[in-house]
Amino acid sequence: MIHTPTGSSRRILTFPAVNPCESISLTTLVDSLLQLAGEILSFKPKHFSTNKRSVKETLRHVQTLVIFFEELRIQIRVGSIPAGRSVILSLSELHVIFQKLKFLLDDCTRDGAKLYMLMNSGQVSAHFRDLTRSISTSLDTFPVRSVDLPGEVNELIYLVMRQTRKSEARPDRDDKRAIDSVYWFFNLFENRINPNSDEILRVLDHIGVRKWRDCVKEIDFLREEISVGKKSNIEIELLSNLMGFICYCRCVILRGIDVDDEEKDKEEDDLMMVRSLNVDDLRCPISLEIMSDPVVLESGHTYDRSSITKWFASGNITCPKTGKTLVSTVLVDNFSVKQVIQSYSKQNGVVMGQKGKKKVDVAESLAAEEAGKLTAEFLAGELIKGDEEEMVKALVEIRILTKTSTFYRSCLVEAGVVESLMKILRSDDPRIQENAMAGIMNLSKDIAGKTRIVGEDGGGLRLIVEVLNDGARRESRQYAAAALFYLSSLGDYSRLIGEISDAIPGLVRIVKSCDYGDSAKRNALIAIRSLLMNQPDNHWRILAAGIVPVLLDLVKSEEISDGVTADSMAILAKMAEYPDGMISVLRRGGLKLAVKILGSSEVSPATKQHCVALLLNLCHNGGSDVVGSLAKNPSIMGSLYTASSNGELGGGKKASALIKMIHEFQERKTGPGEPVLERERFVHAW
């Protein structure tokens, strides 16, 4: 996919040219042709790593045609060129051809697509040949004899016609050699043999991939190309092979992790922006999912295109957020928000799910699979025998590879990386500890990885808890919290984590501390929630760690995101399922706070659902005292009716159950002779 500065996109090697309108003036058409020609001629042969001969020939033809267009413009100004249909038709066809040539040249110089364009140089040559011959066809229809042009210009036209008609563009000889080498590398990978590094460097140098950062761009492009559109098995296999090859090159051959100053500044700016933003601002108000295609309504509010389109298709002509009637339902792309979402996704390893996109998760070919294993074995070796700098480089690669790829997680676990990472967790070098902890966090998502991390005696868990409490950097402690979340998904591990005396207090400390941002707090919160959900015996440990007052104080703060509020309310709701948890929540004003949040218009439906669950559990365990206190609140019924009609994931049923409970209480209270709910204990609810 190619992204233009305006935010529009097109698939590589596709040429969506637009025909000039039939009513276009001759002056406008010629001016536009000259502008297009100028853009084409701004490309220089040195910018191209493949198909250089075809490029040179094409640029030469365009340069010649510029003389023709400039003479046309002069003759038009003096009124000697009639704007006949044949003239307009011929020049319009040339305009379309020039648009396609511009697209093709853009593709040939596409940053990140150099390896892909090399392997498709035959197809690229065919495109150059077809477009060049089309120039001859278009000029054939131009009425040269009826237009008063200088003789030398007419000769140039005939010259271009002859040359373009006989165009035999074909792949360059050097390109063919490089392609053969790449296929030879694939063959070696299939047989689990490491290719000669000098041969790989020769190919990489030919296409202009000379730095670690260049490999990153190639990988990003290939991942995008694999994920979009329908492709044949042959195309998927080639793309997968290229992905395995370029990952091998990045990790094994071009190991100097580099970032240009300009790119580094941009990445740091993006990182600062991502850390400061509220991720819920990137969610569609309708679907509550992070938007993949944000658009703006007339009201100024942004929604995901698919969600707002369904809203309009259902007969609604109002803004979902304000309820105001819209004069226009025109949708305008919100490129600013889209760029922020792309930066957020990149920094957090989020793969945006888009319709028609294939998830890039496994190797689709034998060569790619074996290349991945060779890469993993190399990195595992660097952790054991490499010096400090080589170890850091290997750790960074492991961290990157395991961020979103289940395939590389599996390869690295098989290669024995987990054991090496666990050994260096106690490193005095903060860089080593942070990257090792990040790698463990990612590998804890793998089933086999979980087993190896925990170890036979649970020693791995104790190491992670050490980092959680005493890690050199906040980031290391945050990754430790996230690792505990993934590991706690298994009941036995959840029990083992709970039995480590410093584990739960360490998580609560992150939630409570002002030194951590929302992202770190959410990592700790979801870990606590997982420990609570997967091992009920952990509830008393979590209660003893003081989680209830910490969460209630946190939710009262206006500085946290809705996501933190939702996670906090979910834990409180679960704690209220137990009598001691219910008492702790009530004694600290949890009932009043939940009612307040439920009636707020500034929190998400998910947060309100957790509020309903908390209120329901408080009423179930607190008896008539709690139900009575809740029934006295004049706003509660309206909030519950809204929640029951909008509720998802069981939230609506819980709201309805709570409404029924309040109604039954009120009927028993007012009806003659009706029994009152048994009062098992007295609790001050408000």
Curated annotation (Swiss-Prot):
Its EC number is 2.3.2.27. Pfam families: Arm (PF00514), PUB10_N (PF25368), U-box (PF04564). ARM repeats lie at residues 406-445, 448-489, 491-533, 536-577, 579-620. Disulfide bonds: none annotated. SUPFAM superfamilies: ARM repeat, RING/U-box. Transmembrane segments: none annotated. Functions as an E3 ubiquitin ligase. This is U-box domain-containing protein 19. It comes from Arabidopsis thaliana (Mouse-ear cress). The gene is PUB19.
